[in-house]
Amino acid sequence: MVRADRDRWDLATSVGATATMVAAQRALAADPRYALIDDPYAAPLVRAVGMDVYTRLVDWQIPVEGDSEFDPQRMATGMACRTRFFDQFFLDATHSGIGQFVILASGLDARAYRLAWPVGSIVYEVDMPEVIEFKTATLSDLGAEPATERRTVAVDLRDDWATALQTAGFDPKVPAAWSAEGLLVYLPVEAQDALFDNITALSAPGSRLAFEFVPDTAIFADERWRNYHNRMSELGFDIDLNELVYHGQRGHVLDYLTRDGWQTSALTVTQLYEANGFAYPDDELATAFADLTYSSATLMR
């Protein structure tokens, strides 16, 4: 179903289901078979959501070993690279003395529970109320405790999340580290720019930002993606990202941030794989997404 302007979701529907999909891939990366990342919460969170296809994926009940694009190790490797990028971003920020951290569209992200945060750190998680409530309750039922102070900001990012964040205690006068992981493609281009405008307005000099982006989201309407989606559907994965993403050129984002005083750096997904000791796949689908870009930035003004 195509997106509506004020659509809502939980972790089993629409954009929310993509958070469950990502968590399932994190669970594969964390599985002892591969042990590429440390995330003991991904698999139980996926099981708690109750989407059959992702529960079967984390429980190794989908026969995909012979399909190169759905090979579990391939999925695990890709998600490990992404997860390590954002994990290291936050750890580097702590080493620089930053003490407040904002995870936008936090989904089933458990970094507040699993990373080694310095004493006094505050992690703000911003997402839909339904998503925040589910994750908080599920992790509590699992007996998990945050590794540092965790403050939830239950708000739609299309609403006044900046005020809600400050109401939760965020201090715009001191540096912060922000992440927008797996978020930008689900925003219209103008909403993406507005998101970065808000981040800039709330950031003191020395603040840091990490995100990834697809320069041209038209790839999700490409025949290569359609072929992949059709194969996904055969296996039970019925999320059509082409109906969830907002199309448009995103390649301006680095220049946009630079004009606002951010010093940016970027890695293509191919370079990110290489930095983690992996070879990027060379099949049709991987080639289509070879310009996926991971970026970090520091506010210099």
Curated annotation (Swiss-Prot):
Signal peptide: none annotated. PANTHER family: S-ADENOSYL-L-METHIONINE-DEPENDENT METHYLTRANSFERASE YKTD-RELATED, S-ADENOSYL-L-METHIONINE-DEPENDENT METHYLTRANSFERASES SUPERFAMILY PROTEIN. It comes from the Bacteria. GO terms for cellular component: peptidoglycan-based cell wall; plasma membrane. Keywords: Methyltransferase, S-adenosyl-L-methionine, Transferase. It is an enzyme of class 2 (transferase). InterPro entries: Ppm1/Ppm2/Tcmp, SAM-dependent_MTases_sf, SAM_mthyl_Trfase_ML2640-like. Exhibits S-adenosyl-L-methionine-dependent methyltransferase activity. Pfam families: LCM. One of its GO terms (biological process) is methylation. GO terms for molecular function: methyltransferase activity. S-adenosyl-L-methionine binds at D127, D156, L157. Belongs to the UPF0677 family. The keyword Nucleotide-binding does not apply. This is Putative S-adenosyl-L-methionine-dependent methyltransferase Rv0830. SUPFAM superfamilies: S-adenosyl-L-methionine-dependent methyltransferases. It comes from Mycobacterium tuberculosis (strain ATCC 25618 / H37Rv). Its EC number is 2.1.1.-. The keyword Zinc does not apply.
